[in-house]
């Protein structure tokens, strides 16, 4: 079977393969990030989103893999064979888990569309010959250039006055903003 764990999310293994292996944080760092940001949702009996479900499954599979690795480390007496198993897990299976965890954490953090746009733009950048591409790779950020941020509770202005047409030279008063969290 040819199963692509990213297909239902609009991505592919190939799309993630454009990112170099050293791009992805360690599994430990990714697990810590997932716990810090999404512990309540991941431990909740409620269904939050397909990304939460995929993240739960990846975390559980990683735990099972570590249990197997501990068993192999304890029961495989030949040090050379043990090192081969550890090396294989770290380079192949570990990378797949790092990619999977990074993808779902990033989709939850930045939004699926932003992550997909990033993967496509990075893929285009990396395949463009160095002489014809910008020196810096695209950066995944929370606010893509097309995003418009508006304050809560205020209607959008019809037009924004240009800085040259300012009516008053006196300092502006600042409105106090509540520090409520916005989800």
UniProtKB/Swiss-Prot annotation:
Sequence motif Bipartite nuclear localization signal, residues: 158-175
Sequence repeats: 155-161, 162-169, 170-177
Similarity field: Belongs to the orthohepadnavirus core antigen family.
GO cellular component: host cell; host cell cytoplasm; T=4 icosahedral viral capsid
Protein name, UniProt field: Capsid protein
Residues bearing the modification Phosphoserine: 155, 162, 170
Organism: Hepatitis B virus genotype D subtype adw (isolate United Kingdom/adyw/1979) (HBV-D)
GO MF: DNA binding; identical protein binding; RNA binding; structural molecule activity
Assembly, per entry: Homodimerizes, then multimerizes. Interacts with cytosol exposed regions of viral L glycoprotein present in the reticulum-to-Golgi compartment. Interacts with human FLNB. Phosphorylated form interacts with host importin alpha; this interaction depends on the exposure of the NLS, which itself depends upon genome maturation and/or phosphorylation of the capsid protein. Interacts with host NUP153.
Function: Self assembles to form an icosahedral capsid. Most capsids appear to be large particles with an icosahedral symmetry of T=4 and consist of 240 copies of capsid protein, though a fraction forms smaller T=3 particles consisting of 180 capsid proteins. Entering capsids are transported along microtubules to the nucleus. Phosphorylation of the capsid is thought to induce exposure of nuclear localization signal in the C-terminal portion of the capsid protein that allows binding to the nuclear pore complex via the importin (karyopherin-) alpha and beta.
Alphabetic keyword roster: Capsid protein, Cytoplasmic inwards viral transport, DNA-binding, Host cytoplasm, Host-virus interaction, Microtubular inwards viral transport, Phosphoprotein, Repeat, RNA-binding, T=4 icosahedral capsid protein, Viral penetration into host nucleus, Virion, Virus entry into host cell
Positions of region (RNA binding): 177-183
Region (3 X 8 AA repeats of S-P-R-R-R-[PR]-S-Q): 155-177
Post-translational modification (record): Phosphorylated by host SRPK1, SRPK2, and maybe protein kinase C or GAPDH. Phosphorylation is critical for pregenomic RNA packaging. Protein kinase C phosphorylation is stimulated by HBx protein and may play a role in transport of the viral genome to the nucleus at the late step during the viral replication cycle.
Compositionally biased residues, Basic residues: 149-176
Residue span of region Disordered: 136-183
Protein's UniProt keywords contain Phosphoprotein: yes
Xref: Pfam families: Hepatitis_core
GO biological process, one term: symbiont entry into host cell
Domain of life: Viruses
Subcellular location: Virion; Host cytoplasm
